[in-house]
């Protein structure tokens, strides 16, 4: 690819939720882009996925046509009186805590009356998102192997030998991001790779009739089950026809034993052994027996010192891969895409091109970083903290469910769910314009 001197063109590496959201936004704004995806097609790995109110607010601003399509297929809690519930807390121990004074009648639930739970299957979500993106702007089987920056362009080389030039590279290539490593290894090598959080999980999607046979009415409302160094998460997807679940084991003092990979095929016996013991309700052993014997390490990007350098930036899991316990990773990636798209639109509209635009680009990406990085980092930190609550490792709460629920039920998610994203965009654009004026 050769970029004309007057052409502003964005490379998006990675076709996950954040990359697709950015592509949707850029397409609507008329900003030229190409998505480069390593896989041969869009990935459906991940099964259940959802957006909080902040994610839906961001998508409304990116593409108003998204919401009606998404709401036509997503599903929430079954009970009409539980639509506001994010999760309801119970125990992993025999009896599930049904006899505890804090349990029953949604007493152990947390959420918000202005929140409505919505979850979908990842494939259904991607089908909607990709319907807003021209297929000719997407290239599959593109494994990025090299990045080279010049004052007037960034060059990408792929494993098939193709070399392309773009004005900006936006890396949304997931937790094991090539773009992140390029960005951070020279100055912050300890941040280049994801960090093991001290826990692993097993995951599955099963038909609701099978789930109901095991868990009964506990399948009606999204649940988190708390336990000593173990936990479980479950919620309905696919219009209520299936249950998505994770079963988690915490190993806080151990290192991940499989360097260079985040998953490991193991035996059925090894998987079942993680949920042995008299302190675990037998229903969870029946559930884990339905999972594939694949151990998923729970990794995250514990700290990230910058989301950009010159013409290269990161978003989504490449920037802030997180624990899943606030179901917030996808929405944070969409927020990234929203702010970044407005910055890139501003750069496209500028008459400056080539080397002369580098200062402008730095001002724009610095503004993106200033708005998005602190908020995404806070979400990441809080999601990790919820994990410590689930495994009864929280330094303040321990295994005291009354203390845990007090934390979760008193506005724990309000700051995350109800931001003013229009104000975030305006603040980013204002900072960018001010920086450009100062340097003029």
Curated annotation (Swiss-Prot):
The protein's location, in the record's own words, is: Membrane
Q: Name one GO molecular function term.
A: monooxygenase activity
| Chief localization | membrane
Q: Which domain of life is it from?
A: Eukaryota
The protein's matches in InterPro entries, at most eight in alphabetical order, are given as:
FAD-bd, FAD/NAD-bd_sf, FAD_monoxygenase
Q: What induces it?
A: Expression is induced in response to 2-benzoxasolinone (BOA) exposure.
Q: Which UniProt keywords apply?
A: FAD, Flavoprotein, Glycoprotein, Membrane, Monooxygenase, Oxidoreductase, Transmembrane, Transmembrane helix
Membrane disposition:
Single-pass membrane protein
Function summary: FAD-dependent monooxygenase; part of the Fusarium detoxification of benzoxazolinone cluster 1 (FDB1) involved in the degradation of benzoxazolinones produced by the host plant. Maize, wheat, and rye produce the 2 benzoxazinone phytoanticipins 2,4-dihy-droxy-7-methoxy-1,4-benzoxazin-3-one (DIMBOA) and 2,4-dihydroxy-1,4-benzoxazin-3-one (DIBOA) that, due to their inherent instability once released, spontaneously degrade to the more stable corresponding benzoxazolinones, 6-methoxy-2-benzoxazolinone (MBOA) and 2-benzoxazolinone (BOA), respectively.
Q: Which family does it belong to?
A: Belongs to the paxM FAD-dependent monooxygenase family.
What name does this protein carry? FAD-dependent monooxygenase FVEG_08293
Q: Origin organism of this chain? A: Gibberella moniliformis (strain M3125 / FGSC 7600)
Organism classification, top ranks?
A: Eukaryota, Fungi, Dikarya, Ascomycota, Pezizomycotina
